[in-house]
């Protein structure tokens, strides 16, 4: 049977489903299986069989329709493939989704009900985009003539063969294991920070605003012998990248990581490194190592993972930190849009808590990103470039977006981002510019753009003068898109 849509037509159809809910069989609400069936029905006018998503490769006759492929380490999924997750997902029922992008390390999918709970009426878990690290328990299914493949998450034992009516009993496969953390305790020597007199009450998770080279080892090399004057600019307890944890302070010591007396004294600060320079996959791995270290410490101190013990830097002071995690897991960028709203803050905290609890329970969680984040789109781009500082004291970084002015004129400057620079013209309400650079200077956030061969500098909000990532920004004078 020929599919009713081409691959490109089907991908476009999937994109139109985002934000909607599907209950094809009218049972148990909006399940992942319903979303797979919605796509299958569009393609063939048929419904898939199976008690749970994990049964799809076994309970259906795909002759002339599709081919089941082993998701081996060198297998590269294609857009339009269907991915089937095994029984270690979905409380034993598995999971199913449609692939729209893939590498050998991860897949980006359209899916429904990844978080569970879709059986309850009113649950707001519509179809959306998610990112999944490649797992050892998936299958892929490819449609004949369309390359929609049902991919079983990578099984490294006997190759699965759809033609076997009674597949061989699978040998037990090793369960995924957490990475082995390399914990280096080398306490800073330039100043002996005071003791708190008790265990920490919890952990504050930071993003370091560091470049690609700002690894845990790099921080160690730069800070372990740093003088007091440097440590006063900020020192956390631990720095994490890859599988390396540099412990810069003893657990009993106060840190200088929140610009707040309570946060510094009672909470252990951990920096997720490379938050400005690393690609998304690298940063997500750094996050996972951080969650694993958080789990180890909380268990050591006899503390649970909850909203009281897992804290964010922006709970203690007005800051964009943790900026990269905010973008990836809530879709909100506090660097360009201002302080993280309370609902987004709780969303981010709860994601952290869920990941940490999994490690505390001996499980290996799957990193996910918000469908509002650029990391979940088909054209993944870095969340932010590294802030740099020039000889004039201007912080700047590359960023391409459109600013649309609000209801008041703004004075545009030439030459540079200073209020003392020559006036260019009055940027009128409702006007817009496509900028390529963001700057912090002279009490304002500026964007730089070129119009008719002239470079212009436009202030778009106030800035308190604090260096990134601790800058405090005023309300935006328009909109960024």
Swiss-Prot record:
EC number: 3.5.1.28
Residue ranges annotated for the SH3b domain, each copy included: 398-466
Function field: Autolysins are involved in some important biological processes such as cell separation, cell-wall turnover, competence for genetic transformation, formation of the flagella and sporulation. Autolysin strictly depends on the presence of choline-containing cell walls for activity.
Gene Ontology terms describing biological process: cell wall organization; establishment of competence for transformation; peptidoglycan catabolic process; sporulation resulting in formation of a cellular spore
The keyword Cell wall biogenesis/degradation is assigned to this record: yes
PROSITE patterns in the cross-refs: CHAP, SH3B
Note: This protein is probably encoded by a prophage (AC Q8SDS7).
UniProt family annotation: Belongs to the N-acetylmuramoyl-L-alanine amidase 2 family.
Domain N-acetylmuramoyl-L-alanine amidase: 198-323
CDD domains: PGRP
Name assigned to this protein: Autolysin
Localization per record: Secreted
């Amino acid at each position: 049977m020929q599919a009713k849509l081409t691959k490109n037509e089907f991908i476009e159809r999937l994109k139109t489903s985002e934000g909607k809910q599907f209950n094809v069989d009218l049972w148990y609400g909006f399940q992942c299986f319903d979303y797979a069936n919605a796509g299958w029905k569009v393609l063939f006018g048929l419904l898939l069989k199976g008690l749970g998503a994990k049964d799809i490769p076994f309970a259906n006759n795909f002759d002339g329709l599709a081919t089941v492929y082993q998701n081996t380490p060198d297998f590269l999924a294609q857009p339009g493939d269907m991915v089937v997750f095994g029984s270690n997902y979905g409380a034993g029922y598995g999971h199913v989704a449609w692939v729209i992008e893939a590498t050998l390390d991860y897949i980006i999918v359209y899916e429904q009900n990844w978080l569970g709970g879709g059986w309850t009426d009113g649950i707001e878990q519509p179809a959306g985009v998610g990112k999944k690290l490649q797992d050892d328990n998936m299958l892929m299914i490819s449609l004949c003539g369309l390359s929609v493949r049902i991919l079983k998450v990578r099984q490294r034992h006997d190759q699965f063969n759809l033609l076997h009516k009674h597949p061989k009993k699978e040998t037990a496969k090793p369960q995924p294991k957490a990475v082995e953390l390399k914990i280096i305790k080398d306490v800073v020597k330039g100043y002996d920070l005071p003791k708190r007199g008790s265990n920490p009450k919890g952990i504050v998770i930071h993003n370091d605003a560091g470049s690609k080279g700002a690894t845990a080892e790099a921080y160690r090399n730069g800070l372990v012998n740093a003088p007091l004057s440097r440590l006063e600019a900020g020192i956390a307890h631990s720095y994490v990248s890859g599988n390396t944890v540099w412990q810069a302070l003893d657990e009993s010591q106060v840190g200088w990581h929140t610009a707040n007396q309570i946060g510094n004294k009672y909470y252990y600060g951990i920096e997720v490194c490379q938050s400005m320079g690393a690609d998304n996959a690298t940063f997500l791995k750094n996050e996972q190592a951080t969650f694993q270290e958080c789990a180890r410490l909380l268990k050591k101190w006899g503390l649970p993972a909850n909203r009281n013990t897992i804290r964010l830097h922006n709970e203690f002071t007005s800051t964009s930190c943790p900026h990269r995690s905010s973008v990836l897991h809530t879709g909100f960028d506090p660097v360009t849009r201002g302080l993280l709203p309370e609902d987004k803050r709780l969303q981010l905290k709860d994601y952290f808590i869920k990941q940490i609890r999994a490690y505390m329970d001996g499980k290996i969680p799957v990193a996910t990103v918000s469908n509002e984040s650029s990391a979940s789109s088909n054209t993944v781009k870095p969340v932010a470039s590294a802030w740099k500082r020039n000889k004039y004291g201007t912080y700047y970084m590359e960023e391409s977006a459109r600013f649309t002015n609000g209801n008041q004129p703004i004075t545009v400057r030439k030459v540079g981002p200073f209020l003392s620079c020559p006036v260019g013209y009055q940027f009128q309400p409702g006007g817009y510019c496509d900028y390529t650079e963001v700057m912090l200077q002279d009490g304002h956030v500026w964007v730089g753009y070129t119009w008719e061969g002239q470079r212009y500098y436009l202030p778009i909000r106030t800035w308190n003068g604090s260096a990134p990532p601790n800058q405090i920004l005023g309300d935006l004078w328009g909109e960024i898109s």
